[in-house]
């Protein structure tokens, strides 16, 4: 895949990074459950996805936009009674990142 700086990055490298982000998103669940800070890791994930989007000028806005919206929305799900919504949203994010991986493989 070509960056906006005209630098070619192998698809496998991008896929590995997306899989790493997938794992980081999944780790937010036990972190929140155990009372460990999950907001800073979430901010880092959002930052990296924004950076990837900017760097690669992804043609996958139909995936990136809802992914970032859902991730940003996690910040509002802090109350104990919000955990099931938090969990559901995490799994929706995981599915969207999986969609990014599939699209990179197709190209």
List each model region and its residues.
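Amphipathic alpha-helical interaction modules
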Residues: 23-70
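Amphipathic alpha-helical binding modules
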Residues: 68-107
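Short, solvent-exposed segments of well-ordered alpha helices
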Residues: 5-16, 36, 55-65, 80, ...
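Short terminal alpha-helical segments
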Residues: 1-39, 90-99
């Amino acid at each position: 895949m070509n960056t906006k700086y005209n630098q070619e990055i192998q698809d496998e490298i991008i896929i590995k990074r997306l899989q790493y982000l997938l794992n980081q998103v999944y780790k937010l669940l036990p972190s929140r459950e155990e009372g460990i800070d999950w907001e800073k890791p979430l901010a880092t994930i959002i930052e990296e996805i924004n950076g990837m989007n900017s760097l690669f000028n992804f043609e996958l806005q139909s995936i990136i936009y809802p992914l970032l919206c859902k991730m940003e929305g996690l910040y509002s799900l802090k109350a104990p009674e919000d955990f099931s919504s938090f969990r559901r949203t995490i799994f929706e994010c995981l599915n969207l990142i999986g969609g990014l991986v599939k699209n990179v493989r197709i190209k």
